[in-house]
From Swiss-Prot:
<dbReference type="Pfam" id="PF00861">
    <property type="entry name" value="Ribosomal_L18p"/>
</dbReference>
<dbReference type="InterPro" id="IPR005484">
    <property type="entry name" value="Ribosomal_uL18_bac/euk"/>
</dbReference>
<keyword id="KW-0689">Ribosomal protein</keyword>
<dbReference type="GO" id="GO:0003735">
    <property type="term" value="F:structural constituent of ribosome"/>
</dbReference>
<dbReference type="GO" id="GO:0006412">
    <property type="term" value="P:translation"/>
</dbReference>
<keyword id="KW-0699">rRNA-binding</keyword>
<keyword id="KW-0687">Ribonucleoprotein</keyword>
<comment type="similarity">
    <text>Belongs to the universal ribosomal protein uL18 family.</text>
</comment>
<keyword id="KW-0694">RNA-binding</keyword>
<dbReference type="InterPro" id="IPR004389">
    <property type="entry name" value="Ribosomal_uL18_bac-type"/>
</dbReference>
<comment type="subunit">
    <text>Part of the 50S ribosomal subunit; part of the 5S rRNA/L5/L18/L25 subcomplex. Contacts the 5S and 23S rRNAs.</text>
</comment>
<dbReference type="GO" id="GO:0022625">
    <property type="term" value="C:cytosolic large ribosomal subunit"/>
</dbReference>
<dbReference type="GO" id="GO:0008097">
    <property type="term" value="F:5S rRNA binding"/>
</dbReference>
<protein>
    <recommendedName>
        <fullName>Large ribosomal subunit protein uL18</fullName>
    </recommendedName>
</protein>
<comment type="function">
    <text>This is one of the proteins that bind and probably mediate the attachment of the 5S RNA into the large ribosomal subunit, where it forms part of the central protuberance.</text>
</comment>
Length: 116
């Protein structure tokens, strides 16, 4: 089994547990160049989203694939979710290690007011 397949299997296990809880989830995806975050309802409707591919976020950054960029994405997605009335979510790290950009995004979202 290769690295990507292992990550996707971990992600499926976590998503199944979150689905059983029936709560909104904060989904994180990262690539070498960008970081993406979405708040998704139990009915699989995207309630809020932010990424380093957006012009509004990219204008604040020098580089898009680092920890500082992930912090901006976390803060932005949390603010947008709170505007929509979502304050409590489950954190879905998509099988990525809770380290570096993923952890930075989570910490920034917590500081901006999301609870998980």
């Amino acid at each position: 089994m290769d690295k990507k397949t292992s990550r996707l299997r971990r992600a499926l296990r976590a998503r199944k547990k979150i689905q059983e809880l029936g709560v909104n989830r904060l989904v994180v995806h990262r690539t070498p160049r960008h970081t993406y975050a979405q708040v998704i309802s139990p009915e699989n409707v995207v309630l809020a989203a932010a990424s380093t591919a957006e012009k509004a976020v990219t204008e604040q950054l020098k580089y898009t694939g680092n920890v500082d960029a992930a912090k901006v994405v976390g803060k932005t997605v949390a603010e947008r979710a709170i505007e929509k009335g979502v304050a409590v979510v489950a954190f879905d790290r998509s099988g990525f290690k809770y380290h570096g950009r993923v952890a930075a995004l989570a910490d920034a979202a917590r500081e901006a007011g999301l609870k998980f």
